[in-house]
């Protein structure tokens, strides 16, 4: 049986079927159990319990319920280490970042900091410093796949598993090229990437400021709406049109290439469900997708912008970085200023042409990832597995990025 979502749990609190204190105890029990091995880099039980015991907390939108924080966000009094040992001795944050402050104001009980890919630079979910969480099937409340475990996706790996297991109702994370959507897909939960800069990114350690987005994972779409409204400070208007008034596009080019049979079956099942509910689904062709490889031939935004932030730290502490992460950051050193400017112009032109191509459509449907989660052993740290790791990383990040 899957864990109840935030909406259902808050309703149960308001009807006195449970209490914030009982829920805090339950979530802490899960967070300390084997199902959450390597999920948290720091637990804050006192913070969660104190929030749950605050008079009137049940009247706030989050009712004192458990929220996990990716180790990329400033929380007052805590070190923002970004899943790395390099920043372990950095001074604690002087204040909450805006995203955390908004969650607290809405009644969030902070259960702890979640593990992540070092410096958020991979979609697989590995962390050689703190261990790699094992993916959890949030739809059926059980471990995903065979003994030994599967990768949870990244970079918001711990955040996803904290939500899927029920240790948290919301997992605060970030998404640059898939870091919310990939782990949400692999753990059977909901991941919503909003518009970049919709939520302030101050106090969030950057990967690529041009693309970084503050967002969250939840166990239901209705919870995702609540989380988005809190983080963005805006209301989501209700849609009053029936589904048969929406035109949805499906593009086989690019998005479905190299898709394994399990992902293909799941995607086809989704299309059948939407069609049966009245949605108009049209196959479309988007030849501009074939230009992406050329557009990013010099490395793309993430290596260049991350290198700008890391270059001095990498020079001093390079051997202490995850070698796979260091290699991707180091690639940014080779990008010339003219190439970066070409990339900015090329991206703007590509977006303009893509918007024109999508005229008349309400949405484009695609599988979030074209493959199921690889086993942890197959992509574990080690040069002998680098080829398998980078192949999996490229496939997992291809569609969302």
Where are these regions (language model features)?
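Gly/Ser-rich, acidic/histidine-flanked active-site/gating loops
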Residues: 213, 230-297, 303, 333-334
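Short helix-loop capping/hinge segments that flank enzyme active sites or metal/cofactor-binding pockets
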Residues: 62-85, 245-247, 300-355, 367, ...
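General beta-strand structural signal in soluble alpha/beta enzymes
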Residues: 69, 110-113, 172-174, 283, ...
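Short, well-ordered alpha-helical
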Residues: 1-92, 117-122, 267
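Short glycine/serine-rich loop segments
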Residues: 95-97, 101-228
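Acyltransferase
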Residues: 17-25, 53-54, 97, 262-285, ...
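Glycine-rich, small-residue loops and helix-cap segments
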Residues: 27, 64, 105, 109, ...
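Charged, often glycine-rich, active-site loop that binds/positions anionic groups
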Residues: 124, 130-131, 293-309
